[in-house]
């Protein structure tokens, strides 16, 4: 699967927000000038059209979860077929991804690192190996580390970092057993208020 290999902080500056490419423990504001676009004329931000605002919001969320355009559009189509609010359904589908849940638990210090753990068969779902990052986790699922991966220093380091963060209320983590339980699908109020999913729906509805 293709992925972005360029400078991560440049994307944060383009979207004018922290996309959590780093561990999230130390602020990146000193390194990342959010008030400036990347490039030679980054200080000259132009006023965006309605379409531009919608596009930037879509790009921000897509990059936050590390999703390529075609897959992101498929998530939108799936969300539009589900009952309820399409925008909220879209966010829930993204949150239910195994790589994202792995990150939320704290096994990976970033979503990219969590995705790599899943791809390398280090993650178990209900004691079964799952190596598909987009796998949809269900309420009640137990996410743990493969026994051959428990001694990986980076997983332990990520867990130590995650203990400094607040664990999402829809996830229960047992740091001693190195496992997490996906208790429920998050409610919209549980997720970031900085995401405006309605702009994304307006963009794709055109």
UniProtKB/Swiss-Prot annotation:
Gene Ontology annotations for the cellular component aspect, listed alphabetically: small ribosomal subunit
Subunit structure: Part of the 30S ribosomal subunit. Contacts protein S5. The interaction surface between S4 and S5 is involved in control of translational fidelity.
Gene Ontology BP term (one): translation
Residue ranges of every copy of the S4 RNA-binding domain listed in the record: 96-156
Gene that this sequence comes from: rpsD
Statement: the UniProt record of this protein carries the keyword RNA-binding: yes
UniProt keyword list: Ribonucleoprotein, Ribosomal protein, RNA-binding, rRNA-binding
Coiled coil: none
Annotated source species: Buchnera aphidicola subsp. Baizongia pistaciae (strain Bp)
Function comment: One of the primary rRNA binding proteins, it binds directly to 16S rRNA where it nucleates assembly of the body of the 30S subunit. With S5 and S12 plays an important role in translational accuracy.
One Pfam family it belongs to: Ribosomal_S4
GO molecular function: rRNA binding; structural constituent of ribosome
UniProt xrefs under SUPFAM superfamilies: Alpha-L RNA-binding motif
Entry's family note: Belongs to the universal ribosomal protein uS4 family.
SMART domains from the UniProt entry: Ribosomal_S4, S4
Protein name according to UniProt: Small ribosomal subunit protein uS4
Record PROSITE patterns: S4 (PS50889)
PANTHER family: 30S 40S RIBOSOMAL PROTEIN (PTHR11831), SMALL RIBOSOMAL SUBUNIT PROTEIN US4M (PTHR11831:SF4)
């Amino acid at each position: 699967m293709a992925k972005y290999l360029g400078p991560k902080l440049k994307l944060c500056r383009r979207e004018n927000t922290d996309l959590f490419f780093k561990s999230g423990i130390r602020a990146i504001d000193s390194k990342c000038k959010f008030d400036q676009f990347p490039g030679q004329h980054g200080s000259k931000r132009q006023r965006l059209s309605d379409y531009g605002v919608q596009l930037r919001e879509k790009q921000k969320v897509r990059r936050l979860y590390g999703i390529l355009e075609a897959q992101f559009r498929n998530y939108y189509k799936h969300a539009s077929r589900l009952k309820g609010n399409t925008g909220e359904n879209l966010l829930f589908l993204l949150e239910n991804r195994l790589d994202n849940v792995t990150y939320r638990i704290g096994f990976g210090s970033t979503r990219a690192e969590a995705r790599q753990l899943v791809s390398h068969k280090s993650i178990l779902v209900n004691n079964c190996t799952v190596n598909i990052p987009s796998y949809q986790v269900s309420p009640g699922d137990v996410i743990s580390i493969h026994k051959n991966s428990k001694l990986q220093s980076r997983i332990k380091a990520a867990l130590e970092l995650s203990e400094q963060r607040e664990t999402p209320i829809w996830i229960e983590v047992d740091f001693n057993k190195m496992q997490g339980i996906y208790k429920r699908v998050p409610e919209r109020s549980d997720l970031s208020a900085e995401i405006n999913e309605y702009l994304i729906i307006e963009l794709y509805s055109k």
